[in-house]
Amino acid sequence: MFNISPANHEFDDEIQSKIDNKTKPLGALGELENLAKQLALVLGKDKPEIINPKLLVFAADHGIASSGVSIAPSEVTTQMVMNFVAGGAAINVFCRQVGLDMEVIDCGILQPLEGVEGVIDQRLGAGTGAIHKQAAMTLGAVKQGLEMARTRIELHHQQGCNLIALGEMGIGNTSSAAAIMATVMGMKGVDCVGRGTGIDAATLKRKQMLVEQALHIHEAELTDPYNILACLGGFEIVQMTGAMLAAAERNMLVIVDGFIATAAAMVAVQINANVRDYMIFGHQSDERGHCLMMEHLQARPLLRLGMRLGEGSGAVLALPLIRAAAGFYNEMASFSDAGIEI
Protein backbone atom coordinates (compact mmCIF):
# COMPACT_ATOMS: atom_id res chain seq x y z
CA MET A 1 0.00 0.00 0.00
CA PHE A 2 2.92 2.34 0.71
CA ASN A 3 6.13 2.07 -1.31
CA ILE A 4 8.84 3.43 0.98
CA SER A 5 12.54 3.20 0.26
CA PRO A 6 14.96 3.06 3.19
CA ALA A 7 17.22 6.06 3.70
CA ASN A 8 20.19 5.92 1.33
CA HIS A 9 23.21 4.84 3.37
CA GLU A 10 25.57 4.90 0.39
CA PHE A 11 27.12 8.15 1.61
CA ASP A 12 27.24 7.32 5.33
CA ASP A 13 31.01 7.69 5.58
CA GLU A 14 31.11 10.89 3.55
CA ILE A 15 28.38 12.50 5.66
CA GLN A 16 30.03 11.42 8.92
CA SER A 17 33.38 12.75 7.74
CA LYS A 18 31.82 16.12 6.90
CA ILE A 19 30.33 16.30 10.41
CA ASP A 20 33.54 15.15 12.10
CA ASN A 21 35.67 17.73 10.27
CA LYS A 22 33.68 20.75 11.38
CA THR A 23 35.54 23.13 13.70
CA LYS A 24 34.69 21.33 16.92
CA PRO A 25 35.84 18.32 18.91
CA LEU A 26 34.49 14.98 17.71
CA GLY A 27 30.94 14.49 18.95
CA ALA A 28 30.83 17.87 20.67
CA LEU A 29 27.38 18.70 19.29
CA GLY A 30 25.92 15.49 20.68
CA GLU A 31 22.47 14.57 19.40
CA LEU A 32 22.56 17.42 16.89
CA GLU A 33 25.23 15.47 15.02
CA ASN A 34 23.03 12.38 14.80
CA LEU A 35 20.16 14.57 13.68
CA ALA A 36 22.27 16.28 11.03
CA LYS A 37 23.29 12.89 9.66
CA GLN A 38 19.66 11.80 9.44
CA LEU A 39 18.77 15.02 7.61
CA ALA A 40 21.61 14.47 5.15
CA LEU A 41 20.65 10.84 4.55
CA VAL A 42 17.03 11.75 3.79
CA LEU A 43 17.25 15.21 2.22
CA GLY A 44 20.63 14.95 0.48
CA LYS A 45 24.24 15.01 1.60
CA ASP A 46 25.29 18.26 -0.06
CA LYS A 47 22.97 20.78 1.56
CA PRO A 48 19.96 19.39 3.43
CA GLU A 49 17.45 22.15 4.05
CA ILE A 50 14.06 22.28 5.75
CA ILE A 51 11.63 23.64 3.16
CA ASN A 52 8.08 24.86 3.78
CA PRO A 53 7.43 22.75 6.91
CA LYS A 54 3.86 22.22 8.12
CA LEU A 55 2.09 21.12 11.28
CA LEU A 56 -0.96 18.93 10.76
CA VAL A 57 -3.26 18.55 13.77
CA PHE A 58 -5.71 15.66 13.43
CA ALA A 59 -8.85 15.79 15.59
CA ALA A 60 -11.44 13.10 16.37
CA ASP A 61 -13.62 11.78 19.16
CA HIS A 62 -13.53 8.39 20.88
CA GLY A 63 -16.48 6.30 22.01
CA ILE A 64 -14.66 5.19 25.15
CA ALA A 65 -14.72 8.79 26.42
CA SER A 66 -18.40 8.42 27.35
CA SER A 67 -17.36 5.86 29.98
CA GLY A 68 -15.44 8.42 32.00
CA VAL A 69 -11.76 7.91 31.18
CA SER A 70 -10.94 11.64 31.15
CA ILE A 71 -11.54 14.72 33.25
CA ALA A 72 -13.05 16.34 30.15
CA PRO A 73 -16.18 15.39 28.17
CA SER A 74 -16.04 14.74 24.42
CA GLU A 75 -17.42 18.21 23.74
CA VAL A 76 -14.00 19.60 24.64
CA THR A 77 -12.58 18.14 21.43
CA THR A 78 -14.81 20.44 19.40
CA GLN A 79 -14.16 23.37 21.71
CA MET A 80 -10.41 22.91 21.36
CA VAL A 81 -10.67 22.68 17.58
CA MET A 82 -12.44 26.03 17.64
CA ASN A 83 -9.67 27.34 19.90
CA PHE A 84 -7.09 26.18 17.34
CA VAL A 85 -8.95 27.98 14.58
CA ALA A 86 -9.13 31.13 16.71
CA GLY A 87 -5.39 30.96 17.37
CA GLY A 88 -5.70 30.73 21.15
CA ALA A 89 -4.23 27.33 22.04
CA ALA A 90 -0.71 26.57 23.22
CA ILE A 91 0.08 25.02 19.85
CA ASN A 92 -0.90 28.22 18.05
CA VAL A 93 1.47 30.20 20.25
CA PHE A 94 4.32 27.75 19.67
CA CYS A 95 3.73 27.76 15.91
CA ARG A 96 3.91 31.54 15.87
CA GLN A 97 7.11 31.44 17.92
CA VAL A 98 8.91 29.11 15.51
CA GLY A 99 7.31 30.39 12.30
CA LEU A 100 5.37 27.26 11.37
CA ASP A 101 2.12 27.04 9.43
CA MET A 102 -0.56 24.88 11.03
CA GLU A 103 -3.67 23.21 9.68
CA VAL A 104 -6.49 21.51 11.57
CA ILE A 105 -8.11 18.37 10.17
CA ASP A 106 -11.47 17.03 11.36
CA CYS A 107 -11.09 13.25 11.13
CA GLY A 108 -14.30 12.53 13.01
CA ILE A 109 -15.30 14.72 15.93
CA LEU A 110 -18.83 14.17 17.25
CA GLN A 111 -20.42 17.23 15.67
CA PRO A 112 -19.36 18.28 12.16
CA LEU A 113 -18.02 21.82 11.95
CA GLU A 114 -19.69 22.65 8.68
CA GLY A 115 -18.66 25.95 7.21
CA VAL A 116 -15.99 26.68 9.83
CA GLU A 117 -13.11 28.32 8.02
CA GLY A 118 -9.76 26.76 8.82
CA VAL A 119 -11.01 23.21 9.48
CA ILE A 120 -10.32 20.62 6.79
CA ASP A 121 -13.01 17.96 6.45
CA GLN A 122 -11.57 14.44 6.35
CA ARG A 123 -14.27 12.86 8.47
CA LEU A 124 -14.51 9.11 8.82
CA GLY A 125 -17.49 9.25 11.17
CA ALA A 126 -18.88 10.98 14.25
CA GLY A 127 -16.51 9.50 16.80
CA THR A 128 -15.30 5.90 17.00
CA GLY A 129 -17.03 2.96 18.56
CA ALA A 130 -16.28 2.39 22.25
CA ILE A 131 -13.31 0.03 21.99
CA HIS A 132 -14.14 -1.83 25.20
CA LYS A 133 -17.48 -2.87 23.67
CA GLN A 134 -16.95 -2.98 19.91
CA ALA A 135 -14.46 -2.23 17.15
CA ALA A 136 -13.47 1.40 16.82
CA MET A 137 -14.20 1.33 13.08
CA THR A 138 -14.36 -0.92 10.04
CA LEU A 139 -11.37 -2.00 7.98
CA GLY A 140 -12.88 0.05 5.18
CA ALA A 141 -12.67 3.17 7.33
CA VAL A 142 -9.03 2.39 8.11
CA LYS A 143 -8.15 2.14 4.41
CA GLN A 144 -10.15 5.28 3.65
CA GLY A 145 -8.38 7.20 6.42
CA LEU A 146 -4.95 6.13 5.24
CA GLU A 147 -5.77 7.27 1.71
CA MET A 148 -7.19 10.59 2.91
CA ALA A 149 -3.95 11.26 4.75
CA ARG A 150 -1.92 10.30 1.70
CA THR A 151 -3.87 12.79 -0.42
CA ARG A 152 -3.24 15.56 2.11
CA ILE A 153 0.48 14.82 2.26
CA GLU A 154 0.67 14.72 -1.53
CA LEU A 155 -0.77 18.24 -1.65
CA HIS A 156 1.93 19.53 0.70
CA HIS A 157 4.63 17.65 -1.19
CA GLN A 158 3.53 19.35 -4.42
CA GLN A 159 3.87 22.70 -2.62
CA GLY A 160 7.51 21.94 -1.82
CA CYS A 161 7.13 20.81 1.79
CA ASN A 162 9.79 18.32 2.90
CA LEU A 163 8.99 18.10 6.63
CA ILE A 164 5.73 17.64 8.49
CA ALA A 165 5.06 17.76 12.20
CA LEU A 166 2.06 15.82 13.48
CA GLY A 167 -0.26 16.61 16.36
CA GLU A 168 -3.69 15.53 17.56
CA MET A 169 -6.72 16.40 19.61
CA GLY A 170 -9.26 13.90 20.88
CA ILE A 171 -10.73 13.32 24.32
CA GLY A 172 -10.19 9.64 25.15
CA ASN A 173 -7.34 9.09 22.73
CA THR A 174 -4.77 8.14 25.36
CA SER A 175 -6.92 5.07 26.06
CA SER A 176 -6.77 4.09 22.41
CA ALA A 177 -3.02 4.76 22.26
CA ALA A 178 -2.42 2.68 25.39
CA ALA A 179 -4.33 -0.25 23.90
CA ILE A 180 -2.29 0.00 20.70
CA MET A 181 0.94 0.16 22.70
CA ALA A 182 -0.02 -2.93 24.70
CA THR A 183 -0.83 -4.86 21.54
CA VAL A 184 2.28 -3.92 19.57
CA MET A 185 4.65 -4.41 22.50
CA GLY A 186 2.96 -7.48 23.98
CA MET A 187 2.29 -5.79 27.31
CA LYS A 188 -0.62 -5.71 29.72
CA GLY A 189 -2.95 -2.80 29.22
CA VAL A 190 -2.73 -1.82 32.87
CA ASP A 191 1.00 -1.17 32.41
CA CYS A 192 0.43 1.15 29.45
CA VAL A 193 -2.37 3.33 30.78
CA GLY A 194 -1.42 6.72 32.20
CA ARG A 195 -3.25 9.71 33.64
CA GLY A 196 -3.83 11.46 30.31
CA THR A 197 -5.55 14.76 31.07
CA GLY A 198 -4.71 14.39 34.77
CA ILE A 199 -7.30 11.94 36.05
CA ASP A 200 -7.57 10.87 39.69
CA ALA A 201 -6.80 7.40 41.04
CA ALA A 202 -10.36 6.09 40.73
CA THR A 203 -10.66 7.23 37.12
CA LEU A 204 -7.24 5.76 36.34
CA LYS A 205 -8.38 2.39 37.69
CA ARG A 206 -11.52 2.51 35.54
CA LYS A 207 -9.49 3.50 32.48
CA GLN A 208 -7.08 0.60 33.05
CA MET A 209 -10.00 -1.82 33.40
CA LEU A 210 -11.63 -0.63 30.18
CA VAL A 211 -8.40 -0.85 28.19
CA GLU A 212 -7.86 -4.40 29.47
CA GLN A 213 -11.44 -5.18 28.48
CA ALA A 214 -10.80 -3.82 24.97
CA LEU A 215 -7.70 -5.97 24.59
CA HIS A 216 -9.62 -9.04 25.75
CA ILE A 217 -12.64 -8.74 23.47
CA HIS A 218 -10.55 -8.00 20.36
CA GLU A 219 -7.72 -10.42 21.09
CA ALA A 220 -8.48 -12.78 18.20
CA GLU A 221 -8.64 -9.94 15.65
CA LEU A 222 -5.40 -8.14 16.59
CA THR A 223 -3.40 -10.01 13.96
CA ASP A 224 -2.05 -7.20 11.76
CA PRO A 225 -1.64 -3.41 11.88
CA TYR A 226 -4.81 -2.69 9.93
CA ASN A 227 -6.94 -4.72 12.31
CA ILE A 228 -5.18 -3.13 15.29
CA LEU A 229 -6.29 0.26 13.97
CA ALA A 230 -9.80 -0.98 13.22
CA CYS A 231 -10.30 -2.53 16.66
CA LEU A 232 -8.44 -0.10 18.89
CA GLY A 233 -7.57 3.04 16.95
CA GLY A 234 -9.00 6.50 16.55
CA PHE A 235 -9.84 8.28 13.33
CA GLU A 236 -7.03 10.75 14.06
CA ILE A 237 -4.59 7.94 14.87
CA VAL A 238 -5.39 6.25 11.54
CA GLN A 239 -4.79 9.45 9.61
CA MET A 240 -1.58 10.23 11.49
CA THR A 241 -0.39 6.73 10.60
CA GLY A 242 -1.21 7.37 6.97
CA ALA A 243 0.47 10.77 7.03
CA MET A 244 3.71 9.26 8.34
CA LEU A 245 3.73 6.55 5.69
CA ALA A 246 2.80 8.92 2.87
CA ALA A 247 5.45 11.45 3.90
CA ALA A 248 8.16 8.80 3.96
CA GLU A 249 6.98 7.59 0.57
CA ARG A 250 7.68 11.11 -0.73
CA ASN A 251 11.06 11.39 1.02
CA MET A 252 9.73 13.85 3.59
CA LEU A 253 10.78 13.95 7.24
CA VAL A 254 8.21 13.48 10.00
CA ILE A 255 8.41 14.98 13.49
CA VAL A 256 6.53 12.63 15.80
CA ASP A 257 4.99 14.28 18.87
CA GLY A 258 4.02 12.47 22.06
CA PHE A 259 2.17 9.40 23.31
CA ILE A 260 -0.68 9.30 20.79
CA ALA A 261 1.46 10.21 17.79
CA THR A 262 3.98 7.57 18.83
CA ALA A 263 1.23 4.95 18.95
CA ALA A 264 0.52 5.85 15.33
CA ALA A 265 4.24 5.63 14.59
CA MET A 266 4.39 2.11 16.05
CA VAL A 267 1.59 0.97 13.74
CA ALA A 268 3.20 2.73 10.77
CA VAL A 269 6.43 0.82 11.40
CA GLN A 270 4.45 -2.41 11.44
CA ILE A 271 2.95 -1.55 8.06
CA ASN A 272 6.31 -0.62 6.53
CA ALA A 273 9.48 -0.72 8.65
CA ASN A 274 11.31 1.68 6.31
CA VAL A 275 9.16 4.56 7.58
CA ARG A 276 11.29 4.62 10.74
CA ASP A 277 14.21 6.18 8.83
CA TYR A 278 12.13 9.31 8.25
CA MET A 279 10.95 9.83 11.82
CA ILE A 280 12.33 12.42 14.22
CA PHE A 281 10.96 12.18 17.75
CA GLY A 282 10.34 15.67 19.07
CA HIS A 283 10.09 14.94 22.76
CA GLN A 284 9.52 12.36 25.46
CA SER A 285 6.11 12.87 26.98
CA ASP A 286 5.43 12.66 30.69
CA GLU A 287 2.60 10.23 29.89
CA ARG A 288 3.24 6.82 31.40
CA GLY A 289 4.60 4.38 28.86
CA HIS A 290 6.03 6.85 26.38
CA CYS A 291 9.61 6.14 27.43
CA LEU A 292 8.97 2.42 26.75
CA MET A 293 7.62 3.31 23.32
CA MET A 294 10.84 5.21 22.66
CA GLU A 295 12.90 2.18 23.61
CA HIS A 296 10.78 -0.08 21.41
CA LEU A 297 11.35 2.19 18.41
CA GLN A 298 15.03 2.77 19.32
CA ALA A 299 14.25 6.49 19.36
CA ARG A 300 16.15 9.29 21.04
CA PRO A 301 13.74 12.18 21.68
CA LEU A 302 15.17 15.65 21.24
CA LEU A 303 13.43 17.19 24.27
CA ARG A 304 12.46 16.02 27.74
CA LEU A 305 10.35 18.78 29.24
CA GLY A 306 7.83 16.77 31.23
CA MET A 307 5.02 17.80 28.88
CA ARG A 308 1.83 15.81 28.24
CA LEU A 309 -0.29 18.26 26.28
CA GLY A 310 -0.46 16.73 22.82
CA GLU A 311 -1.57 19.02 19.96
CA GLY A 312 1.89 18.60 18.37
CA SER A 313 3.47 20.78 21.05
CA GLY A 314 6.65 18.75 21.50
CA ALA A 315 7.06 18.32 17.75
CA VAL A 316 6.83 22.05 17.12
CA LEU A 317 9.21 22.97 19.94
CA ALA A 318 11.77 20.57 18.45
CA LEU A 319 11.77 22.32 15.07
CA PRO A 320 14.40 24.95 16.00
CA LEU A 321 16.78 22.13 16.96
CA ILE A 322 16.21 20.46 13.60
CA ARG A 323 16.89 23.74 11.82
CA ALA A 324 20.02 24.17 13.94
CA ALA A 325 21.25 20.72 12.93
CA ALA A 326 20.79 21.54 9.26
CA GLY A 327 22.42 24.93 9.82
CA PHE A 328 25.63 23.65 11.35
CA TYR A 329 25.92 20.91 8.72
CA ASN A 330 25.51 23.41 5.87
CA GLU A 331 27.27 26.49 7.22
CA MET A 332 29.85 25.60 9.85
CA ALA A 333 33.45 25.76 8.64
CA SER A 334 35.65 22.72 8.43
CA PHE A 335 39.13 22.73 9.92
CA SER A 336 40.63 23.12 6.45
CA ASP A 337 38.21 25.97 5.59
CA ALA A 338 39.26 27.81 8.73
CA GLY A 339 42.97 27.07 8.32
CA ILE A 340 43.07 25.25 11.65
CA GLU A 341 45.59 22.44 12.01
CA ILE A 342 44.94 19.72 14.58
UniProtKB/Swiss-Prot annotation:
One of its GO terms (biological process) is cobalamin biosynthetic process. Gene3D superfamilies: 1.10.1610.10, 3.40.50.10210. GO terms for molecular function: nicotinate-nucleotide-dimethylbenzimidazole phosphoribosyltransferase activity. The gene is cobT. SUPFAM superfamilies: Nicotinate mononucleotide:5,6-dimethylbenzimidazole phosphoribosyltransferase (CobT). Belongs to the CobT family. It comes from Shewanella sediminis (strain HAW-EB3). It catalyses: 5,6-dimethylbenzimidazole + nicotinate beta-D-ribonucleotide = alpha-ribazole 5'-phosphate + nicotinate + H(+). The active site is at residue 311. It holds the Pfam family DBI_PRT. Catalyzes the synthesis of alpha-ribazole-5'-phosphate from nicotinate mononucleotide (NAMN) and 5,6-dimethylbenzimidazole (DMB). This is Nicotinate-nucleotide--dimethylbenzimidazole phosphoribosyltransferase.
